[in-house]
């Protein structure tokens, strides 16, 4: 069983190798807009999960997730061979690919936080002109009559 530091180093190295291989060695146009975001390794260093994101050709264009997944699936053997050659370990880990949902989740969280900020601003504006419903201080305080008794 390998230590976690070695698994982390190997994962980072695999991320670099796969990203550069997609950019330089794999000639598939469906992988043009694929970015490798993270790699996680199992403790025995036999399996690596490669996380990726896909963007569209322009800001308005939606990414083609299915085509990118198919292209990565077709290139998995070639990518594993490249990883094995450059990694220099006895056993080349099996690579599995998974879409990274962190960017979408963070965009959703930003939208929720923006909505909460706008609501806070609305409440602050309403609070500016508000006055207490009763007296200024509705709580009973010690008065002179109690202290005189």
From Swiss-Prot:
Keywords: Cytoplasm, Ribosome biogenesis. It comes from the Bacteria. InterPro entries: KH_dom-like_a/b, RbfA, RbfA_dom_sf, Ribosome-bd_factorA_CS. Belongs to the RbfA family. The keyword Nucleotide-binding does not apply. GO terms for biological process: maturation of SSU-rRNA. One of several proteins that assist in the late maturation steps of the functional core of the 30S ribosomal subunit. Associates with free 30S ribosomal subunits (but not with 30S subunits that are part of 70S ribosomes or polysomes). Required for efficient processing of 16S rRNA. May interact with the 5'-terminal helix region of 16S rRNA. Its main location: cytoplasm. PROSITE patterns: RBFA. PANTHER family: RIBOSOME-BINDING FACTOR A, CHLOROPLASTIC-RELATED (PTHR33515:SF1). It is found in: Cytoplasm. HAMAP family: RbfA. It comes from Corynebacterium glutamicum (strain ATCC 13032 / DSM 20300 / JCM 1318 / BCRC 11384 / CCUG 27702 / LMG 3730 / NBRC 12168 / NCIMB 10025 / NRRL B-2784 / 534). Monomer. Binds 30S ribosomal subunits, but not 50S ribosomal subunits or 70S ribosomes. GO terms for molecular function: ribosomal small subunit binding. Gene3D superfamilies: 3.30.300.20. This is Ribosome-binding factor A. GO terms for cellular component: cytosol. The lineage of its organism: Bacteria, Bacillati, Actinomycetota, Actinomycetes, Mycobacteriales. Residues 123-149 are annotated as: Disordered.
């Amino acid at each position: 069983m390998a230590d976690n530091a070695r698994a982390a180093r190997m994962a980072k190295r695999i991320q670099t190798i796969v990203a550069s291989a997609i950019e330089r060695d794999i000639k598939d146009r469906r992988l043009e807009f694929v970015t490798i975001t993270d790699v996680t390794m199992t403790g025995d260093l036999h399996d690596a999960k490669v996380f990726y994101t896909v963007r569209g050709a322009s800001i308005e264009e939606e990414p083609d997730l299915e085509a990118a997944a198919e292209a990565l699936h077709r290139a998995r053997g070639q990518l594993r061979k490249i990883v094995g050659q450059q990694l220099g370990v006895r056993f080349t880990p099996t690579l599995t690919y998974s879409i990274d949902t962190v960017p979408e989740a963070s965009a959703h969280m930003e939208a929720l936080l923006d909505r909460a900020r706008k609501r806070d601003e609305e409440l602050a504006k309403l609070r500016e002109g508000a006055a207490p419903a009763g007296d200024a201080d509705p709580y009973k305080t010690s008065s002179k009559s109690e202290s005189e008794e």
